[in-house]
């Protein structure tokens, strides 16, 4: 179920503070955040946000196609290495 339009997008307050400071200071350093649940806003375009995936911070460059999505969608949490090969079929 999607979020109600009248509520507006959710963004953590501490992330908005960091983004405003980066935009005002023309800072190019990645903004570190653990807030995977925050929605990407148009103010984020052109910034690099390092989103935590449970193990490390994954740097993500925000472009206009990402607006409206959640930050967690771009930092994958699971790594799939493939299923084990069947030893009988290799013979």
UniProtKB/Swiss-Prot annotation:
rRNA-binding among keywords: yes
Alphabetized UniProt keyword annotations: Ribonucleoprotein, Ribosomal protein, RNA-binding, rRNA-binding
Domain of life per record: Bacteria
InterPro entries named in the record: Ribosomal_uS19, Ribosomal_uS19_bac-type, Ribosomal_uS19_CS, Ribosomal_uS19_SF
GO molecular function, one term: rRNA binding
Cellular component aspect of the GO annotation: cytoplasm; small ribosomal subunit
Function: Protein S19 forms a complex with S13 that binds strongly to the 16S ribosomal RNA.
Family: Belongs to the universal ribosomal protein uS19 family.
Protein name per UniProt: Small ribosomal subunit protein uS19
Organism, scientific name: Bordetella pertussis (strain Tohama I / ATCC BAA-589 / NCTC 13251)
